[in-house]
């Protein structure tokens, strides 16, 4: 079979595929190394102040400090001058939720006078509470047919009585306690007596000179309770509040007067009054 066909098809031929030279042998050479170059970093030049610049800035800081010290001394001088003239710069801090007035008993009133001042402050708040309840009582009476006039008068009592009490007797007492001014004590006594008279009058509430039921006192309470028990109860509560306010106010004026006499302020007030009369005469 082998002789007939001449060669065996399964016989390996000893053939070199690269013998013809058509495919070049692999080159074993390396790539050339990269040249060494210096890293190109950014250079940041931070200039250092010279001694001349430092001295200049130091002089500027010293000038600013001197100016601030000058302003501080000027402000202190104005505050001292205002204090000597009786002018007090006050920040509004009361009531806390809506400041309307300056009020700081613990820091501005001497310790031995703070109790009296707190009692007077309670009297002021008590008057506000009485007049506010008086509005409620007259409102119930108005609803039950007593007329709108008494309600309008109750509103007038409140919006005039509370600020009036603060200006006429509470603030003078506050300043008197703080500055030990005898004349301010005299002003307080005058208008606080009027306050006590009004509280006693309101507790009774006669039909004159005010409109009969515009004050929640004992007489209107007796009059209306027969027609309306609810209105009568509101008026009796108002009567009780005015009685408590009257008693508290009497206690306040007694304590303030005892301090006024014991501290020699009465004689001082007489001397100041006499001095004022002489100066006005001449």
Swiss-Prot record:
Subcellular location, in the record's words?
A: Cell membrane; Cytoplasmic vesicle, Secretory vesicle membrane
Q: Would you tell me the Gene Ontology cellular component terms?
A: plasma membrane; recycling endosome membrane; trans-Golgi network membrane; transport vesicle membrane
Keywords for this entry? Cell membrane, Coiled coil, Cytoplasmic vesicle, Membrane, Transmembrane, Transmembrane helix, Transport
GO BP = protein transport
Chain segments carrying region Disordered: 1-36
Q: Which residues cross the membrane?
A: 118-138, 148-168, 185-205, 230-250
The UniProt function text for this chain reads: Probably involved in membrane trafficking.
Q: Which residues form a coiled coil?
A: 48-92
Q: Which residues, if any, are the signal sequence?
A: none
* Regions of this protein lying in the Cytoplasmic compartment: 1-117, 251-282
Keyword Transmembrane helix attached: yes
The gene is SCAMP3
* Keyword Coiled coil set for record: yes
Q: What membrane topology does this protein have? A: Multi-pass membrane protein
What family is this protein classified in? Belongs to the SCAMP family.
Protein known as: Secretory carrier-associated membrane protein 3
Disulfide bond sites: none
């Amino acid at each position: 079979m082998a002789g007939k066909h001449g060669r065996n098809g399964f016989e390996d031929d000893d053939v070199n595929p690269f013998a013809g030279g058509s495919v070049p042998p692999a080159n074993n050479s390396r790539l050339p190394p990269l040249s060494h170059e210096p890293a190109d970093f950014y250079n940041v030049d931070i200039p250092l102040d010279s001694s001349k610049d430092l001295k200049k800035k130091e002089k500027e800081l010293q000038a600013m400090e001197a100016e601030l010290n000058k302003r501080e001394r000027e402000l202190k001088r104005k505050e001292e001058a205002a204090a000597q003239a009786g002018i007090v710069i006050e920040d509004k801090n009361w009531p806390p939720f809506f400041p309307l007035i300056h009020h700081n008993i613990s820091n501005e009133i001497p310790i031995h006078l703070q109790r009296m001042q707190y009692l007077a402050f309670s009297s002021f708040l008590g008057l506000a509470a009485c007049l506010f309840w008086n509005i409620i009582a007259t409102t119930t009476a108005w609803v039950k047919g007593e007329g709108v006039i008494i309600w309008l008068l109750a509103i007038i009592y409140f919006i005039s009585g509370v600020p009036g009490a603060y200006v006429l007797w509470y603030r003078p007492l506050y300043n008197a306690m703080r500055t030990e001014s005898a004349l301010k004590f005299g002003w307080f006594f005058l208008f606080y007596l009027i306050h006590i008279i009004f509280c006693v009058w309101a507790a009774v509430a006669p039909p004159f000179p005010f409109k009969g039921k515009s004050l929640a006192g004992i007489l209107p309470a007796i009059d209306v309770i027969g027609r309306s028990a609810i209105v009568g109860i509101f008026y009796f509560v108002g009567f009780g509040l005015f009685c408590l306010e009257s008693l508290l106010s009497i206690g306040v004026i007694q304590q303030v007067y005892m301090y006024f006499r014991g501290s020699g302020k009465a004689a001082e007030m007489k001397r100041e009054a006499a001095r004022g009369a002489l100066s006005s005469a001449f």
